[in-house]
Amino acid sequence: MADRNDPLLRTPAWRALETHLAEVRPLHLRELFARDPGRGDRLAAEGAGLYLDYSKQRVTEETVRLLVALAEARGLPGRRAAMFRGEKVNATEGRAALHVALRAPRGERIEVDGKDVVPEVHAVLDRMAAFAEQVRSGAWTGFTGRRIRTVVNVGIGGSDLGPAMAYRALRAYTTREIAFRFVSNVDGTDLAEAVRDLDPAETLFLVASKTFTTLETMTNAASARAWLLAALGDERAVARHFVAISTNEAEVRRFGIDPANMFGFWDWVGGRYSMDSAIGLSTMIAVGPGGFRELLAGFRAMDEHFRDAPLERNLPALVGLIGVWNASLLGAETVAVLPYDQYLDRFPAYLQQLTMESNGKRVTASGAPVEGHGTGAIYWGEPGTNGQHSFYQLLHQGTHLVACDFIGFCRTLNPLGRHHDLLMANLFAQGEALAFGKTAEEARAEGTPEALVPHRTFPGNRPSSTILADRLGPGTLGALVALYEHAVFTQGVIWDVDSFDQWGVELGKVLANRIVKELEAPADPALAHDGSTNALIRRYRARRGGSASS
């Protein structure tokens, strides 16, 4: 048997899948369901309050058996155990990836470098809860003594996408006494529009940056600070209107924030895995400490399911392995995430970072090039039914094979006439249409003119999974996020990539730091970029003007 360091394509388990692919590829989902009417019940799994129907994927029970064999050959059980134990599974940075510790219950022992980290996690959670209650109750006031009416989270990447997504997803559970806004883009428009109609005396900024040096975040924070002081006129006001989510006490002090209002997290928490750490302070203020505990409980339930359930009935393992099958073997290199719940409108954007920053890698963990197969798929999507009137045309009749993840809930949070039945009817209909399509004969039988038959024919055989839960809530959201976290990890093990680093974001940062000096230079700088970049810089400098109307 090949060990984990062998190139993927040489493993017997992979070769068995390639042989199996040749047998399965010609089969249409129509044929698979005709042969096996009970397929819809058997190719499904349940855990942590989520139900996964993967019967409309282009797999058979033999496919799943072979994928599980591949996972075992690639060492998934051992790598999973290593992650839960706090071993340094982030090889290139020499760190643990211990987001599961963020939702571990009190009393559980999880060690990093010989130190139990669970007490520290709960110490931070307790401080967050006390602060959140102060803000929610009005006990925490601004510099002038007025209560806080708006919380603005300032961050980027994992310090923004998770909290922003969670706020929108849990809007039905949030306090309506306080408004929440999120600023991430270094484009000044983002901050300007976020604060345009706010009262500085009633605004609290949460500045989320582990190092407190992140370019975009600290640029926005400095401008927010200037906006506040322009109105309140006293440096002491900063300490009542700014809170830090950081580990750099010196920089936090220098900014004017009281270190007592600094909430930390750890190197073993990656940004895209941090929404249930102190990065989630805005979420806790919005839904309350009780709601945040429910969120953590949902994460924990899926953690335990991933850790304990057999791989063939393990939701994250199945989602991850089928994703490998689709992207690396079947040729479906893009995944449309289609939540049929408006509250999840930012969930696809959140998954873009989680999946693509984690597994968008061209070398293995040991630095060898990935050859002969793809790695991370491209994730995107929109809530239903909006997407049906946008890009579903391509899903049904385009030349690209797109795998789809439908997400829906049996009960709505906003009962309104027949809205929810119509919504869910569309979800089920789209999965059915993608799988089975419409033949030319069926189109003709409907009376379609012959010239239009090719246009009214749907090939079908487009793979999709459907995830159902009873109702969207904090616990359900936690389980859903953890499902994809662990699916990403599963794929990383199969592809042998480091799912916890992100070196691909560094080069652009370095070049931007160089270019901004050239843009801000008072005299025309000597440029040494390529011809295109030089020309763009010169044109920008010549035409930027000095006002919004230039």
From Swiss-Prot:
Catalyzes the reversible isomerization of glucose-6-phosphate to fructose-6-phosphate. Pfam families: PGI (PF00342). The active site is at residues 357, 389, 509. Pathway: Carbohydrate biosynthesis; gluconeogenesis; Carbohydrate degradation; glycolysis; D-glyceraldehyde 3-phosphate and glycerone phosphate from D-glucose: step 2/4. SUPFAM superfamilies: SIS domain. Transmembrane segments: none annotated. Its main location: cytoplasm. This is Glucose-6-phosphate isomerase. GO terms for biological process: gluconeogenesis; glucose 6-phosphate metabolic process; glycolytic process. It is an enzyme of class 5 (isomerase). One of its GO terms (molecular function) is monosaccharide binding. GO terms for cellular component: cytosol. InterPro entries: G6P_Isomerase, G6P_Isomerase_C, Phosphoglucose_isomerase_CS, SIS_dom_sf, SIS_PGI_1, SIS_PGI_2. Keywords: Cytoplasm, Gluconeogenesis, Glycolysis, Isomerase. It is found in: Cytoplasm. Its EC number is 5.3.1.9.
